[in-house]
């Protein structure tokens, strides 16, 4: 499985890269795995409700994934596997959750699932969100884990229909770990659950190709300073 570590990258560029990789995988190419940290942004799933965005102060996009409104920002690790869907959809979602759950065990964090809500939970609070899309038998979008995220930004939304106070982070749970340190734990757990080896490749050609694309997710709102 190809791995691309993009560091801090705007949402649209990462979305375009997902589109490029999706096309490659659908055409028979190797599966891919993106790791990224986004600047402040809100995305809403295609069947989500825009009234779950309560403060229109950030970039807000409607995207193909399932789920409702969510926030991405600094201190949050986002993983976008772009993979041929070899499993039932419910199993694939379980595997994404399981990768997060296993990644937290070395930190002494006992995480799990809750009935009726996707994602990963600790003590009744959500530490990771999941939302995917499937087109042509290939899954993309993925999972976001709050490591040192500024949780105040979740008050811009009702995250997946929840009250913002239901969201937590590793730092809030008392785990002092950097995004880079956690990244290694997550990759190890992901490889274990998916029985795959991530082989890291240079993202530069993909970033260059993404920069040439004109397609973008649907923009609902932009910060005033970005739109003037």
UniProtKB/Swiss-Prot annotation:
Belongs to the LipB family. One of its GO terms (cellular component) is cytoplasm. Residues 27-198 form the BPL/LPL catalytic domain. The active site is at 160 (acyl-thioester intermediate). This is Probable octanoyltransferase. The lineage of its organism: Archaea, Thermoproteota, Thermoprotei, Thermoproteales, Thermoproteaceae. NCBIfam families: lipB (TIGR00214), PRK14345.1 (NF010925). It comes from Pyrobaculum calidifontis (strain DSM 21063 / JCM 11548 / VA1). It is found in: Cytoplasm. The gene is lipB. It catalyses: octanoyl-[ACP] + L-lysyl-[protein] = N(6)-octanoyl-L-lysyl-[protein] + holo-[ACP] + H(+). Its EC number is 2.3.1.181. Keywords: Acyltransferase, Cytoplasm, Transferase. It is an enzyme of class 2 (transferase). The record marks 126 as: Lowers pKa of active site Cys. Pathway: Protein modification; protein lipoylation via endogenous pathway; protein N(6)-(lipoyl)lysine from octanoyl-[acyl-carrier-protein]: step 1/2. The keyword Transport does not apply. In the reaction, the free carboxyl group of octanoic acid is attached via an amide linkage to the epsilon-amino group of a specific lysine residue of lipoyl domains of lipoate-dependent enzymes.
């Amino acid at each position: 499985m190809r791995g691309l570590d993009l560091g801090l990258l705007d949402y649209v560029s990462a979305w375009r890269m997902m589109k490029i990789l999706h096309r490659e995988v659908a055409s028979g190419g190797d599966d891919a795995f993106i790791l990224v940290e986004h600047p402040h942004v809100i995305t809403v799933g295609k069947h989500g409700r825009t009234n779950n965005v309560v403060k229109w102060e950030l970039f807000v996009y409607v995207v193909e994934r399932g789920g409702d409104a969510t926030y991405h920002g600094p201190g949050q690790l986002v993983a976008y596997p772009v993979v041929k869907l070899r499993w039932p959809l419910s199993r694939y979602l379980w595997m994404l959750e399981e990768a997060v759950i296993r990644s937290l065990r070395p930190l002494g964090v006992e995480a799990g699932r809750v009935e009726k809500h996707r994602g990963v939970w600790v003590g009744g609070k959500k530490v990771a969100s999941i939302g995917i899309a499937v087109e042509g038998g290939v899954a993309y979008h993925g999972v976001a884990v709050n490591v040192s995220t500024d949780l105040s930004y979740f008050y811009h939304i009702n995250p997946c229909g929840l009250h913002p106070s239901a969201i937590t982070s590793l730092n809030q749970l008392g785990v002092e770990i950097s995004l880079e340190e956690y990244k290694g734990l997550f990759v190890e757990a992901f490889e274990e659950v998916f029985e795959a080896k991530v082989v890291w490749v240079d993202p530069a050609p993909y970033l260059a190709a993404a920069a040439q694309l004109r397609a973008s997710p649907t923009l609902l709102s932009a910060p005033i300073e970005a739109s003037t």
